[in-house]
Amino acid sequence: MKTTHAVWERENLGVDAYEIALDASDTPDLLRQEERRIVAAGAEYIVVKTPVDCPALLFSMQSLGYTYVETVFHVMIRRDEYHMPASIARFDRGLSVVERTEAADRERIYGLIRRGVFKSDRVSIDPFFGREKGGNRYANWLRGMLERGGS
């Protein structure tokens, strides 16, 4: 089990958030203990990530008060082995990539994101938060990444 105090979510969501990543050796009782600890520390929003191959954890989440919200896939493509099918490659013609470095361009893009580009992530579909908070979260994530020199 790995617990992360998601301090960045205070700005994004307005709550003190924690993320708990479980592994195959964890149990519902261990999760309950960790949950009590972080609630005592001020947790207002808790995200629990479970491995897909652990039915004991997956099927206990609802009885612990959690709601299944999203599945995350991790995809890797070995570029040297990948050949794009012609049916997909045809959509790539005529596209261009433009780096936006001006502050006004970035603010315009952040505004587009805040208005609801993302509709199906766990924050946007949560009735407590909604699409506005979800958009704000992604815009802040992008802004922070660019400020740290990411691309």
Locate the predicted segments by residue.
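Short amphipathic alpha-helix that is part of the acyltransferase structural core
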Residues: 15-23, 89-136
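Active-site rim helix/loop that mediates acceptor-substrate recognition in acyltransferases
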Residues: 55-57, 129-151
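Acyl-donor-binding surface of acyltransferase catalytic domains
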Residues: 22-105
